[in-house]
Amino acid sequence: MMEAGAQIINVGSESIAVPFVMLSLYQTSKAGLEMFSNALEAELEESGIRVTVVRAGPMYDESKEAPNWDRDAAMRFHMGCTKNGLDLRTRPVSHSSSVTGVFRAVLDLPPDVKLSHVTIGARKP
């Protein structure tokens, strides 16, 4: 059982706020996770357990493989995102090791600090 001062971190996704196409199931599940986290935070507040959603942006890692989409689906995704004003070719992407410190920072917050949502994104070089 968790005690007062414990911290729950749920990892969300920028996809619920960015105009991607063809990701409706993923986007919906991440939006649901954020709503669940909000409700859980309210339920656990009196017990002193904190809940934070870390909404992550695009990241890469050398061990991560590219999506295995067929060519036509990949083209529809790219064209749909472009139509929605999202240029995937110019979007900055962070290395996964660059953002892990955010999780440590959330865990190390003083017990009197409440941080419900954090958004992590890449910046242009």
PLM features: what roles do these ranges have?
Residues 29:
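Active-site helix of classical SDR
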Residues 1-5:
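A short helix-coil junction within the Rossmann-fold of NAD(P)-dependent oxidoreductases
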Residues 50-60:
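Conserved SDR Rossmann-fold cofactor-binding beta-strand/turn motif
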Residues 13:
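Residue(s) in the substrate-gating loop at a strand-loop-helix junction
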Residues 16-18:
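Conserved catalytic-site region of short-chain dehydrogenase/reductase
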Residues 53, 73-125:
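C-terminal helical subdomain
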